[in-house]
Regions:
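Phosphate/adenylate-binding "loop-and-lid" substructures adjacent to NTP/NAD/dNTP-binding pockets
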Residues: 1-23
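Short, basic, glycine/proline-bearing loop/turn elements
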Residues: 1-2, 136-146
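Amphipathic alpha-helical
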Residues: 3, 145-193
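A short, Trp-centered hydrophobic/proline-enriched beta-strand micro-motif
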Residues: 7, 27, 78, 168-172
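Short, motif-level signal for alpha-helix interfacial/capping segments enriched in acidic residues
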Residues: 11-17, 90-94, 149-155
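Covalent nucleotidyltransferase
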Residues: 17-138, 253
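Classical nucleotidyltransferase
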Residues: 30, 36-80, 181-254
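Short, structured patches in soluble enzyme cores that scaffold and shape functional sites
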Residues: 80-82, 111-116, 144-147, 173-175, ...
Length: 254
């Protein structure tokens, strides 16, 4: 890890902070993305992506897309997640790791923050605005941000982002400077259940299981026929199906 890279901000638990009476509205609410965290900066004239642990990642299409922006902003560090709506988390990680993976250009960078070492006390609302100039850049997404002024508004934001296929909501302090490490300046909030199911059918990209009431459902991912897998979902609907199911792991993974 180089001197240019900071420790990424990490999220506290929203429900725990709410139970302590530690919330201070308003906040920004943003989608919780199930991707790979990265910090991005310009190093010796080249755009470099670093993992959360400081390892360099090679995604040339993203480096090229960010070169004009970061060249004009020396020292700036972008904070976001590598993510693809069309790849499972396992396939996403494989595409990121492999130098020649055919799915590599399916990976986009979802940005939600930045850090300017020349303005270490800069409020989040201003850091977020600094990302606007990246709107419309290929392979780059600036996450949607909603202003929430109550817990009820947080619940509505959670439903909104889950409805878009995300796994939850991130709650950000509007006025806080960038906090390295874990702090309540950023909180995560999601409502999901985990259950085990037997795989009854498979194809190249999906697996199929049955709910306890006998309703079939399919999710993206790969597993063996008859294998027991862990599925994460929001709730069981009145007709017995799962809302927003997602493959988490198989027993082989454990």
């Amino acid at each position: 890890m180089t001197k240019a890279i900071i420790k990424p901000s990490l999220a506290a638990n929203y429900e725990a902070e709410r139970a302590k009476g530690a919330l201070c509205f308003p906040y920004y609410a943003q989608p919780k993305i199930d991707g790979v965290r990265v910090l991005v900066t310009l190093s010796e004239g080249e755009v470099v992506l670093y993992s959360r642990n400081g390892n360099k990642l090679s995604l040339p299409h993203l480096s090229a897309a960010l070169t004009p922006y970061l060249t004009s902003r020396p020292g700036l560090i972008l904070d976001g997640e590598l993510y693809s709506r069309d790849l499972s988390f396992t396939a996403l990680c494989s595409a990121i790791r492999s130098s020649e993976h055919h799915d590599k250009q399916m990976v986009s960078l979802y940005l939600f923050d930045c850090y300017n070492p020349n303005r270490p006390r800069q409020a989040y609302k201003d850091r977020y605005k600094a990302l606007y100039d990246l709107s419309g850049v290929p392979f780059i997404e600036v996450v949607e941000s909603l202003t929430v002024k109550s817990h009820r508004a947080v619940e509505r934001a959670l439903e909104h982002f889950i409805g878009l296929g995300y796994e939850g909501v991130m709650i950000k302090s509007i006025s806080s400077p960038y906090k390295q490490g874990r702090s309540k300046a950023m909180m995560k909030y999601k409502k999901f259940l985990d259950s085990e199911f037997e795989v009854v059918a498979t194809d190249a990209t999906t697996i199929t299981c049955y709910t306890p009431s006998g309703v079939p459902f399919s999710v993206k991912g790969r597993a063996k026929l008859g294998e027991i897998v862990t599925i994460r979902y929001q709730e069981i609907t009145p007709n017995g199906s799962l809302r927003f199911p997602r493959l988490v792991a198989s027993r082989d993974y454990e």
